Amino acid sequence: MTAFPSLFVSHRSPTLSVEDCAASRYLQWLGPQIRDTLGTPEAIVMISAHHDGAGRFGVTTTAAPTTIHDFGGFPEALYRIQYRPPGAPELARSLAEGLRRRGFDMFEDELRGLDHGAWVPLRLMFPDADIPVIQLSMDMRASPDRHHALGNALAELQAAGVLVIGSGSATHNLREFFTGGFRLDSPAPDWVRGFADWLAERIEAEDDDSVLRAVETGPQGQRNHPSLDHILPLFAAMGAGGEGAEGLRVHTSYTYGVLAMDVFGFGDPPSSKGCPIPRARSAPPPMKVYANARLVPRTPRTASPPLRVSLPCGECEGGQGHSERRRLSSG
């Protein structure tokens, strides 16, 4: 079974799903590229900036997630958009059980659908909505390290054919956005570009400690992230790459000046070599190539118990699924 990378995507606002820009074109390219090079994921676990468990981590267990229009003041057409992939309740409950064994206080939500932090990038990447989706909440009261540990507990899902995606924003200062008079194509100020480039450099240097303290110690960190909600999914995605996985910024662009639309891959993201982003109104920015990244061993952390993952199996009677224990190799 294919081992998928974990990804972090910047989702901006619901208008990304209908506006033509380098970031939307990249996500439209990325989904098919994943299918072509790695295969179709068995399921997707989304960690969105707009799902806060308010003191706990949680997982959606609905079989048919609805589309949540959790925004106001946008064009009416956005409220008519429906993105309705199937859920994966058995996998979600198995995931919750495994995370509890790892010390996470988990709740299960049978009613919640997909907020725009989930469905906006998924609709661009996988428009057919044919891959089961689970949404995992953040806990805004928990530390960056705790979210990184949550992601690390999800690392085995890669080897089970599950794609883990954190969805937030590489930079996210809405006060500057609303008061700065920025347009869609406004150039990024130095304080935005400087932080985004520093963040990418630290990720590619595998400097996890600096990344986890980015808001505190990065250049203009607190100005770029007045709150942690849109960077916490990055920490989870970074952890989900697994021990020793390389991280790389696979896309960079800016919209409305202050919003860096970076996409990061952790593990072995697909290569863009020989497969350019489809052209639209303007040429996309250059992309780095990430092909068959070597997993560089790091100093191992304290071993955790294996996460039991239950996936549907066509060989099981009644399609009930079975459990598998998997570990990622760091070599």
Predicted regions and their residues:
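A short aromatic-anchored loop/beta-hairpin motif
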Residues: T2-R102, M106
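Beta-strand elements within well-structured catalytic alpha/beta cores of enzymes
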Residues: P5-V9, A43-A49, L136, L157-A170, ...
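Long, well-ordered alpha-helical scaffolding segments within enzyme catalytic domains
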Residues: A23-G31, D145-A160
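Internal, conserved structured core segments that host functional sites
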Residues: A92-H148, A153
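Surface-exposed, charge/polar-rich loops and edge strands
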Residues: E97, R101, A142, E156-L163, ...
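Cysteine-centered motifs
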Residues: C275, C313-C316
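Low-complexity, intrinsically disordered or signal/transmembrane-proximal segments
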Residues: Y290, Q320-H322
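Short, intrinsically disordered C-terminal tails of secreted or membrane-associated proteins
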Residues: R325-S330
